[in-house]
Amino acid sequence: MTRVINLDGESLTIEDVIAIARQGVACRIDDSAIEAVNASRKIVDDIVSEKRVVYGVTTGFGSLCNVSISPEDTVQLQENLIRTHASGFGDPLPEDAVRAIMLIRINSLVKGYSGIRLSTIEKLLELLNKGVHPYIPEKGSLGASGDLAPLAHMVLPMLGLGKAYYKGELLSGQEALDKAGIDKISLAAKEGLALINGTTVLTAIGALATYDAIQLLKLSDLAGALSLEVHNGITSPFEENLHTIRPQSGQLATARNIRNLLEGSQNTTVATQSRVQDPYTLRCLPQIHGASKDSIAYVKSKVDIEINSVTDNPIICKDGHVISGGNFHGEPMAQPFDFLGIAISEIGNVSERRVERLVNSQLSKLPSFLVKYPGLNSGFMITQYACASLASENKVLAHPASVDSIPSCENQEDFVSMGTTAARKAFEILKNSRRIVATEIMAACQALDLKPENHELGKGTKVAYDLFRKEVNFIEHDKHIEIYDELNKASAVIEDPSFLEAVEQAVELSIQF
């Protein structure tokens, strides 16, 4: 049976977002939501017919909120809003981000507080399920009043305007609708505002980054465990009784992950008089990785709330009361997504330091730059440079976006979140850190193959090593390889969900204890 996810505004999970955004799983509006949507719409229709003054329904927008709009102009008002607010810049957002945006907006609207017609929500749903993906520029949102510019670009194809991708081809909005067999719509009162006023874009990008960060945290533990195998790491820093007296959840989880991954390894060792303890990047794995785990667990808890929230303005209450408030403001997610970027940056930063330990012959006791006949061959020399470059870039990107604000709209919107910038930065940091962790795994596998003794790996590290070596070659010397290709293969391996799934079939990995 084909899987279909019901959207009721209450129960969407981050895993559902991934299934719909990346795996093309279909979704539908849950029957339980229909009554609330229709009731909310009736209230808006009554507002227009009674000529009541309500922001965004019978008034202008932003600082023009005191300009009254006649009932006969309320429809034109909404189309004008979309045409003028679609003012984004930059490259288009990737397909998975666009699909996540459409999904989260639908899920918010079906809660029945936005006054939008059911048929209009169903039109956006039809675009999503039929694979019509609006062209949404990545830049241009202040994260308050919501993600106005990018969401306006999302709406354009619904009106037969703008641009959209269909089956990989960029078309005009109308062409995309025609090829998909979808009719365009006209907006009714308040509907333009209901579609574009909210934190949907920053939440969608941040949700994808958060999910990927959780996978990266597990991969970083694996990378660290492989480095421990290379360096004959001392295992006492991972003993449970050390961590139970400082019961930070992420720290406990990391120590357990390392123990599970290294179970049965013949490469690890115990402290001796000549070697009392390992350096921080190995010994303090639970404390460093664990801190990022705790941060990202917090961010996920915020994402879980936001993807099931109403972030529109004004809000149409069940009793007919209309509230002009600030649920569109991105600050509740801007700060967590800045936190997310910092947490991921630390993972890339410490992984790069372990790459340096692997390629440094004085620290690894292996050939310089992990290649036979160093000098004639350079091996992993510049690979470490590249990782250092990415780690340094991450440190710049990790500067919080949410500490900035530039007033807008004639100072009516005088304090904004910059939350969309925070989410986009976090995703860029994630991509950089993932490349670094992939390189650490590649370098550790190379180092293991260069070790003079060939001892049994741990229960989890052996599974990872065997899978990795099926795709990424040992580098004998420089002459017959292009290391760039091998680095790309390494990244492709760890980005394939089946790699981590196979390791987790062998050993349990988690981010919280």
Curated annotation (Swiss-Prot):
Post-translational modification comment from the UniProt entry: Contains an active site 4-methylidene-imidazol-5-one (MIO), which is formed autocatalytically by cyclization and dehydration of residues Ala-Ser-Gly.
2,3-didehydroalanine (Ser): residues bearing it: S145
Catalytic activity: L-histidine = trans-urocanate + NH4(+)
EC number of this enzyme: 4.3.1.3
Superkingdom as given in the UniProt entry: Bacteria
Protein name: Histidine ammonia-lyase
Family per record: Belongs to the PAL/histidase family.
Gene giving rise to this polypeptide: hutH
Positions bearing the 5-imidazolinone (Ala-Gly) cross-link: A144-G146
Keyword Coiled coil listed: no
CDD domains documented for this protein: PAL-HAL
Subcellular location per the Swiss-Prot or TrEMBL entry: Cytoplasm
EC class (word): lyase
UniProt KW keywords: Cytoplasm, Histidine metabolism, Lyase
HAMAP family assigned to the protein according to its UniProt record, in alphabetical order: His_ammonia_lyase (MF_00229)
Species annotation: Streptococcus pyogenes serotype M6 (strain ATCC BAA-946 / MGAS10394)
Pathway per the UniProt entry: Amino-acid degradation; L-histidine degradation into L-glutamate; N-formimidoyl-L-glutamate from L-histidine: step 1/3
Biological process annotations from GO: L-histidine catabolic process to glutamate and formamide; L-histidine catabolic process to glutamate and formate
Pfam families linked to this entry: Lyase_aromatic
InterPro entries attached to this UniProt entry: Aromatic_Lyase, Fumarase/histidase_N, HutH, L-Aspartase-like, Phe/His_NH3-lyase_AS
Molecular functions per Gene Ontology: histidine ammonia-lyase activity
